[in-house]
Amino acid sequence: ILIGLVGSEMCIRDRYKVKGIMYMIHSVALIIADFLFSKDAITEEEKEVCAYGMELIISGIISVALVLIIGLITGNIWYAVIYNMMMILIRTYTGGYHADTHAGCNVCYCGVYLISLLMLRIQVYIRETIIITWLIALTGYLIIVLNAPLEHHNKKLTIEQKEKYMIVSAVLGIASMLISFILNIIGVVTRYGKYSFLCQISLYINTMLLIIGLLLLLGVRKEGRFHEEDS
């Protein structure tokens, strides 16, 4: 019984911590919205929308900063930079899985980064890595092309936007693989056939394509459940 009570208390405490983080982000967003309103930059009707937008921006900045900090601590800062760039740039057009709370989003964002590093380490130690990594990249690219863009239930897209996002997603995927291919060649040539840091960057870019694709599939599944409950 005592263990159960302690466990319950810890769950309640964690819940309040999460609410505290969300409240802090919400409070800062409201302050910014009020400031913009006082400067006549937005109207009274736009304050709520502005505050929500600021919440998303602040939460996003926190996520990016946390990944960079983890990258510095673990000595993987370049991977952290690439992770942030690809997650922000490509997922802007593909869409994908999003947590229900800002705290959950931050945890997922950092967790996926750690998973990406683990996947990279596994590939580095596996033989025939070149074949595997390009299969990974191709799989991620096909998932993106076949499923992007994912329309969020709170953010509907017009037909023109869907077509634009689909094309941009495909182009960004091809560009990522092209950059990866070039880095791999340069890495091999500069090290006379031996594996180099540039080759690992190439591996990581391909890994991120698969991760973005898998997050897109998770988002498709989540949106599907939402529409089923809504109907």
Which residues make up each language-model segment?
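Single conserved hydrophobic/aromatic residue that forms the stacking wall/gate
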Residues: 1-14
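Hydrophobic alpha-helical transmembrane segments in multi-pass integral membrane proteins
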Residues: 116-128, 171-190
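Cytoplasmic-side transmembrane-helix entry/capping segments in multi-pass membrane proteins
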Residues: 100-111, 130-136, 159-163
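Alpha-helical transmembrane segments
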Residues: 127-140, 204-208
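Structural signature of hydrophobic alpha-helical transmembrane segments
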Residues: 70-85, 131-136
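Short, amphipathic, aromatic/basic-enriched membrane-interface segments that mark the entry/exit
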Residues: 44-56, 74-75, 97-106
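C-terminal ends of transmembrane helices
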Residues: 87-99, 145-154, 220
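Membrane-helix boundary/juxtamembrane motif in polytopic membrane proteins
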Residues: 150-175
